[in-house]
């Protein structure tokens, strides 16, 4: 759940000129989805980085801190520093009837040292306590990819991704041509294991 400014700076550092307005994030997609489906003024419990909190406020959602504040929705986004108590509050809120939204289902994310748990692992913690799945805004769901094509005015995009189960599947779900790169969680050996 990095801010678009961080991603744009990263792309620019790699030699790809980019402005924050060129970046569409799953954090933007999930807060937009909640605002569209539930409306402004919706109380949301956020289990994600402060960037998601900021985006929620920009969309006139009202972040709350605990299930006892009766949130109407829970928004989960990746947070490498998530506290266990935050996941517990998310579980309590969903158990009490709050709608559950997530930015992406990535079980892992690559680092220089190897794979680490991703948002999908954090979702599994809450999921172990409830009887439903979250509504997904990011890949492989369509909202993020459609928002990207709309914002950039793409007519025949090629989606580049390093995860077969989210990036490439998401492109396929949206009818977008994809290019699989070997820089992330999946490699050549996974092509025969994951059927898309």
Task: Report residues per predicted region.
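Conserved Lys-Pro-Asp/Glu-containing loop-to-beta segment of HAD-superfamily phosphomonoesterases
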Residues: 134-169
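A short, gly/pro- and small-residue-rich
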Residues: 83-105, 178
């Amino acid at each position: 759940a990095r801010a678009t400014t961080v991603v744009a700076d990263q792309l620019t550092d790699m030699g790809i000129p980019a402005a924050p307005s060129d970046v569409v994030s799953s954090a933007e997609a999930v807060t937009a989805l909640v605002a569209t489906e539930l409306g402004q003024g919706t109380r949301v419990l956020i289990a994600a980085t402060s960037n998601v909190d900021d985006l929620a406020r920009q969309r006139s959602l009202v972040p709350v801190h605990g299930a006892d504040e009766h949130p109407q929705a829970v928004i989960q986004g990746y947070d490498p520093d998530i506290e266990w108590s935050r996941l517990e509050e998310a579980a309590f809120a969903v158990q009490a009837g709050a709608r559950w939204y997530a930015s992406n289902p990535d079980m892992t994310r690559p680092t220089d040292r190897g794979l680490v748990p991703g948002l999908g692992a954090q979702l599994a913690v809450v999921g172990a306590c409830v009887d439903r799945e979250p509504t997904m805004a990011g890949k492989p769901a369509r909202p993020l990819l459609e928002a990207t094509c709309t914002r950039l005015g793409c007519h025949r995009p090629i989606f580049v991704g390093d995860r077969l189960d989210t990036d490439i599947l998401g492109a396929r779900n949206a009818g977008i041509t994809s290019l699989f790169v070997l820089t992330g969680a999946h490699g050549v050996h996974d092509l025969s294991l994951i059927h898309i």
